């Protein structure tokens, strides 16, 4: 708002100049802060009342409040205004730099993680609740803290009464106290795999893309949060946060990515938005399980997955269970042996699931019918896929039959030899 106000009535008296002339320029309120000090240089006119000794400089600290009244009074003809602002250490720094100094967020101690157990002060937003145009004197400026138009007419600058101004200030103090009280309340986050880890916690859908695309049907789950360090020549041991997340829509589309940043929240955001750009489509048999058993080795991690009927559920490693739910797999058994590095486990799982072969692909490859034997159907085979081309007459050669290595625990379970180590234990008499 640029409300033009002409000079105050006592300007001629302050400057010692003759009245009867108006200022040639208009003074705008946004260029006259109340706390500023103005030095007015009075240039003598050609009249008899002027003299060479009258040239001087007069300063007024109460000129700002006088200019807040809308008036039009005569003023000297040649008056130049120069603005003086108080200059100190606090005007050189920004609010963020001042807060960092007050909260001890800078220095080697903060970078190396020292002082974490002390009672830390909280940063306050001092601009919160402030309205442009509001002041202690209670002036109502149309377009700032008051509507510009009222009943079809432009409002003029008015002032609240003393009682109304006290009520407005009391309401503002009460509102700030409520904000501080709400900030201290802790909201219980969703429980993940355990109470003291970030694994399994949902981050919500990824952020919308630059072209307006949204991912509301996707969900993001945290798999791992680690603090990593890099030794630099300038800052020494520099700490950063590495986050591994997985995203999926529950209908076969899923992906994973890593986000790195100095702050944990920034790492979450980076990983979540990056994972949606590296999606895999996983084929599912009847939208509930995998097409066939999968056994794979990724680096030092060994994963063995088995197809299961409906109602079996997910009996897997907790990270595999989280990823399968994001994919849409509901029934599967998986066993992890060797290294349980989270990144190797995730990469190996996506590699094995994305390379599985559907029944139709297997039928076209072998030129044979693909049949399935179910326990409820007995020896009756169920045809699940047929080749699209000509059917081969001769059976599959023995060399092409995959050599599946059986797990000894599975063999003992089938033959009834697998028993608990505590089955024959007898408690001593007391």
Swiss-Prot record:
Its main location: mitochondrion. It holds the Pfam family Ribosomal_S5. It is found in: Mitochondrion. Gene3D superfamilies: 3.30.160.20, 3.30.230.10. Keywords: Mitochondrion, Ribonucleoprotein, Ribosomal protein. Residues 111-125 have a biased composition (Basic residues). InterPro entries: Ribosomal_Su5_D2-typ_SF, Ribosomal_uS5, Ribosomal_uS5_C, Ribosomal_uS5_N, Ribosomal_uS5_N_CS, Ribosomal_uS5m_N, Ribsml_uS5_D2-typ_fold_subgr. Component of the mitochondrial ribosome small subunit (28S) which comprises a 12S rRNA and about 30 distinct proteins. The gene is MRPS5. GO terms for cellular component: mitochondrial inner membrane; mitochondrial small ribosomal subunit. The keyword Ribonucleoprotein applies. Residues 218-282 form the S5 DRBM domain. GO terms for molecular function: RNA binding; structural constituent of ribosome. Transmembrane segments: none annotated. Belongs to the universal ribosomal protein uS5 family. Residues 108-128 are annotated as: Disordered. One of its GO terms (biological process) is mitochondrial translation. This is Small ribosomal subunit protein uS5m. It comes from the Eukaryota.
